Amino acid sequence: MALLTLKVNGREVSRDVPPATLLVEFIRETLRLTGTHVGCDTAQCGACTVHLDGKAVKSCNTLALQAHGAEVTTIEGLAAADGTLHPMQAAFRACHGLQCGFCTPGMVMSAVDLVKNHGCHNETQVREALEGNICRCTGYHNIVKAVQQGAAAMAK
C-alpha cells in the first residue's frame, strides 16, 4: 500500500492504495464518484476522461499514484456548488448531444479541455479533437454542435 494524496473536485483526499490501482478505480470505487465511466479499459473510448492538473487524461490507463499531489476534476466537479451546470454540460443538454449518456461525461471533459487548452471551435477541429472519444449511439452531429455552443458560452 502507498499513501495517495491529491485534490479531487477541489477537496483534499488522502487514502492508502495498492500501487497498481488505476485512477478510474480510485475515483469510482474508493471515492464513489461514478460519473467517470469505464468503457474499454484500453484508453480507446474516452469514457474515463478526467482532468489531471487541468489537462484531459484517460483515467483507465493512469495509475492513481501518478496523480499524487495533483488536482483531479471529474464530471461531478464541473457543475457549480449550487448545481448550475457548466456551460459545456448545458450545451450538451440543449443540443441533445447524447443518447444513452454513457460516453457523455468523457465527451464533456474532453470538450472542456479542448476549449480551455486549445481554443479550437470549428467543426473539423472539434471532430479531430474528439477522435479519442467513441459514441456508439449518435452520428456525432449533435455532439459537435454541443461542443461549439459550449465553447461559445465558455468564451463569454
Residue ranges and their predicted role:
Residues 1-156:
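Signature of N-terminal electron-transfer/Fe-S-associated modules in redox systems
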